[in-house]
Amino acid sequence: MQLTALEIIRRESLQKLRELGINPYPAKEFKTTATIDEILTNFKKFEGKEVILAGRMMSRRVMGKASFSELKDASGRMQIYINRDELCETDDKTMYNSVFKKLLDMGDIIGVKGEVFKTKVGETSINLKELTLLSKSLRPLPVVKTDAEGNVHDAFSDAEQRYRQRYVDLIVNDHVKETFIKRTKITNAIREFFNSRGYLEVETPILQPIPGGAAAKPFITHHNALDIPLYLRIANELYLKRLIVGGFDAVYEFSKDFRNEGMDRTHNPEFTVMELYVAYKDYNWMMKMTEDLLEKVAKDSNGTTEVQIGENKVSFKAPYPRVPILEAIKTHTGFDVSGMNETELREVCEKVGIEVDETMGIGKMIDELFGEKCEHTYIQPTFITDYPKEMSPLTKEHRSNPALTERFELMVNGKELANAYSELNDPIDQKERFEEQLKLSEKGDDEAMFIDQDFIRALEYGMPPTSGIGIGIDRLVMFMTNSSSIQDVLFFPQMKPEKKAPSVELNDNEKALLKIIETNSPILLNDLKAH
């Protein structure tokens, strides 16, 4: 273990605190009476009154017998004024001269008791009367500075380091915490919208014997007791439909899904999807519901239906345009691909510069055409509708064109945000669609769907006409917070393995420090330096 000079000094301070009889990690509950935000927003209510706060010490300015510090709790930051003789009313000034001035460090978690007042310059502050150490910080925090123009410069701006050590990122970068607070507002808004309509929130299995409901590569594991392979779910769709078969009229779930595929700025192998299924509805009804839902989410999280996403101002105000996918492809490529066979589609793909191979069927090639040539052009919310049957094995056949299905995807800022259907409830048709997927799998398509015989059995008992939708929560949060990477809206995104420093032989100084930690024995910093 290699320690920096500052880390060694902090460990020495830890020992000195213990020698003074101060437990740096007390177990007893510390009862607070207010938060910083409550005091700042209701100063008149708290003025002149005694309060108890707890938080992290973020700065310290020592000015002889008086000092200033900044305390940060979960709600905000506030100045603490420390007068030596008010903190230490007896002749013993240890708490000020030794503990506060020398042994406490930036990042330490403390409890403070004092009166609320305003300084001569009008800053709301606490006049400290009692100080309690609640947790000693052994690593120094990165230093964050604001220049004269108000620009923030911090020593913790490396993206990879921020994602790995999100706990530090949250401490020093207040705007990061705001992103995750807004994420909760977004999911709360969705829950309120559904719960007000009587929809039931449910939970379905994460470990599944068959990974169904989407075209994606699953993660595979093994159950030792049952001696069977299991898969981390790629979607929860088929289980939610089983609940519709069972008699629920409307169910939804915020599900953690997993896909063993690539990682980029919009994809993480573990992600959150909200799926909703409502009986006796179709995809036209679902489009209207989606517009109403996203209007509410935008207003609740941003106070307006207009949201800045990168360079674009996007309006979530209904209604949204509806564009059939084959019309979109014709508009952006000049080719009418409706009715084309595999050979003809392959020729079109080659003409527009899209690589194809023999494993790709009609659905896959149409998906590639739209994704490469059309998707990025839809900045404002747009429903792309009426997908070919080959692309949608779980979707009901279109009521006026048997070659198409009643499916839509919602595009926002050039990306897919939601996917929805009039759900296929014909068990015979569903079995045939699964068998077509099996043929694609045999051709080498590793994203083709598995055949789920139990789901077919459930449909044979009868599922009412149903519409369902899946909304990518991580991507929705990216849009509503104007975040450019999915890693910015996940507390702990998946990362490549951290590079470890090469192992080194401990020197005498480090061995002595290791002994302190292992035996909890006191040793002076000067003794360490003597080594």
What are these regions (language model features)?
Residues 1-503, 524-525, 529-531:
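Class II aminoacyl-tRNA synthetase catalytic cores and aaRS-like
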Residues 518-524:
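Short capping segments at the starts of secondary-structure elements
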Residues 499-513:
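Short alpha-helical segments that sit at the start of domains
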Residues 9, 508-512, 523:
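Alpha-helix N-cap/N′ positions at the starts of helices
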